[in-house]
A protein has these predicted regions:
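N-terminal alpha/beta PP-like core and its mobile active-site loop of ThDP/TPP-dependent enzymes
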Residues: 2-343, 383-386, 466-469, 494, ...
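Phosphate/pyrophosphate-binding active-site segments
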Residues: 2-3, 139, 202, 298-394, ...
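Active-site diphosphate/adenylate-binding microenvironment
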Residues: 9-22, 30, 35-40, 352-432, ...
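Active-site nucleophile and cofactor-binding loops and adjacent substrate-binding regions
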Residues: 27-29, 48-59, 74-81, 136-137, ...
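Short acidic/His/Gly/Ser-rich catalytic and metal-binding motifs that mark active-site loops
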Residues: 35, 171-174, 247-250, 355-357, ...
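Thiamine diphosphate
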Residues: 102, 116-117, 268, 312-314, ...
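Generic enzyme active-site microenvironment
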Residues: 161, 303, 391, 444-445
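Conserved short loop/turn motifs at secondary-structure junctions
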Residues: 215-219, 365, 446
Length: 565
């Protein structure tokens, strides 16, 4: 392809298009104006979504990436514009979400002079990105963009930052598009060791009580089919991490539910009873393991992961299997024998019955006509035929949504797992509607988290984004209040919330809305929400002091889950 002399800003636009980008989220400002001017001429091919705060741009890019499997992109200015994306970048790093953040920067000759809106973005973001690079010359644009996208989406995905100096945006360059599929000294997908695969297969073939822990890595590796073939051949039950919940349908008979502090009783307790523990694309987060000194000490541990740094980081591994789990699972499935573990699988039933009797039935079948959080979640899930994309904020709403929503399709849960970012939900849901416009997107929020990025209702209004917002309003910072009730003597220190009238707020943003306060109002309201074209806000006034159970107490083991407060 012949080279053409264009500006660095124009080269950026063409490079994004060459990478397949069609949607980006951003907010203009001084140091990025030449690039936004170039974007003006590409507005028919690059759909720019104007957010109301740069944090919203980063979270929207995350939501887009999580549901689509593509790289999310955001475009912001220097200084506060760039620093406003930091929380989203950190969130993407810990949750392995591929995004590219392009931020304006002062001209190269002004660097280090404390110029207006100058910050050392590369220095700030190096610990929370896979790669952070400052583009000082227009001739580096095509290479930097190609490298950024390759790094963001290869291996264990994650965020990349491009700090785009203003002089590089206006300089002329002989442009030639570029793609990369190799970087020397960067090995994103290690090849699995055949000896390790054989050792893992031998352990699985001889196991009497195997348990598979399913993480987000299964979805990131597009290994859902391989996972099902693996567990079905050896008849092995599994539990899913928060981010791995939609890697296998909720209805699958070998899926025993969610792992973690507020997960299901069976898979948590059985972690300390299994004889072989097979972790697939998960990182043994502290919310999953509980007290490490007592975690799965009786079991041989097999860990399948693409990232060697996760091996032995939290839990001692007997057999590590490095590589993309799409391939390692397929290889391992060929090596294991067809088996059956009916007695072991049946032993989960007593825990399922106990949890249903003490927790679930009370949550989804209230006796006094008041609304419970889990009841609302289950009703929305069923009304959407369990096919909607679930987005959550952080807090009780997150755990209730994760527990009571059901999943039938992959890439169906978008939530802030590792960082636990309140305010994530609303902008992430906006991104999800652009990433998968063919699917219904439902976001569950608390009254605390909604107000953290409530300005993005303006983005929803402008774009007519069909986000279905379910506000679980309990007039508390509910998760903190629950801890205060259980462990701090019911001293509710600054957790009660005085809330605005959300119906009036929705009206101001031209978003149809409805408030429900009783069980008998719920079904009609959900039907109205799901059949309304465009966005909708459903405010469910739930009981104020509801608690998320079961719960592993702080410092406790996974087999010490509390069923009541």
């Amino acid at each position: 392809m012949a080279k053409e002399k264009i500006t660095g800003a124009e080269a950026m636009m063409r490079s994004l298009e060459y990478q397949g980008v069609k949607t980006l989220f951003g907010y203009p400002g001084g140091s990025i104006m030449p690039t936004f001017d170039a974007l003006y001429h590409h507005r028919n091919t690059l759909n720019h979504i104007l957010v109301r705060h740069e944090q919203g741009a980063a979270h929207a890019a995350q939501g887009f990436a999580r549901v689509s499997g593509e790289v999310g992109v955001c475009l912001v200015t220097s200084g506060p514009g760039a620093t406003n994306t930091i929380t989203g970048i950190a969130d993407a790093m810990i949750d392995s979400t591929p995004i590219v953040v392009i931020a304006g920067q002062v001209g190269a000759s002004f660097l280090g002079t404390d110029a207006f809106q100058e910050v050392d973005l590369v220095g700030i973001t190096q610990p929370i990105t896979k790669w952070s690079y400052q583009i000082r010359r227009a001739e580096d644009v095509a290479w930097a963009v190609a490298r950024a996208f390759y790094i963001a989406k290869s291996g264990r995905p994650g965020p990349v930052v491009l700090d785009f100096a203003k002089n590089a945006q206006v300089e002329m360059v002989d442009y030639e598009p570029m793609k990369l599929d190799f970087i020397r000294s960067y090995d994103p997908e290690p090849n699995p060791d055949k000896e390790s695969l054989q050792e893992a297969a031998e352990l699985i073939n001889n196991a009497q009580r195997p348990l598979v822990l399913v993480g987000q890595g299964v979805e990131l590796g597009n290994a859902q089919d391989e996972l099902r073939a693996f567990i079905e051949k050896a008849d092995m039950p599994c539990g899913c991490t928060l981010l791995g919940l939609s890697a296998i349908p909720t209805s699958h008979p070998l899926n025993k539910g969610m792992l973690g502090m507020h997960g299901n009783l069976g898979p948590n307790v059985k972690t300390n009873e299994c004889d072989v523990l097979i972790a697939v694309g998960m990182r043994f987060d502290d919310r999953v393991t509980g007290k490490l000194d007592t975690y799965a000490k009786q079991a041989k541990v097999i860990h399948l992961d693409i990232d060697h740094s996760e091996i032995d980081k939290n839990v001692k591994v007997d057999v590590p299997v490095l590589g993309n789990c799409k391939y390692t699972l397929a290889m391992l499935t060929q090596l294991i024998r067809k088996n059956e573990h009916s007695e072991w699988i049946d032993s989960f039933t007593e825990y399922e019955k106990t949890e249903y009797e003490h927790v679930i039935s009370k949550e989804i079948h209230p006796v006094d006509g008041a609304l419970n959080m889990g009841e609302v979640v289950r009703a929305v899930s069923e009304a959407s035929n369990n096919e909607a994309v679930l987005v959550t904020d952080v807090g009780q709403n997150q755990m209730m949504a994760a527990r009571y929503f059901k999943y039938s399709k992959n890439r169906s849960i978008v939530t802030s797992g590792g960082l636990g970012t309140m305010g994530f939900g609303l902008p992430a849901a906006i991104g999800a509607t652009f990433g998968r416009p063919d699917r219904t997107v439902c976001v569950f929020m608390g009254d605390g988290g909604l107000q953290m990025n409530i300005q993005e209702l303006g983005t929803i209004m402008e774009q007519k984004a069909p986000v279905k917002i379910i506000l679980l309003n309990n007039n508390y910072l509910g998760n903190v209040r629950q801890w205060q009730a259980m462990f701090f003597g019911h001293r509710y220190s600054f957790t009660p919330m005085l809330n605005p009238d959300y119906m009036k707020i929705a009206e101001a943003y031209e978003i149809p809305a409805r408030r429900v306060m009783k069980c008998e109002e719920l079904q009609a309201a959900i039907h109205e929400m799901l059949t309304t074209d465009g966005p909708f806000l459903l405010e469910a006034c739930v009981i104020e002091e509801g608690n998320v159970l079961p719960m592993t107490p702080p410092g406790g083991s996974v087999n010490q889950m509390l069923l009541e407060c």
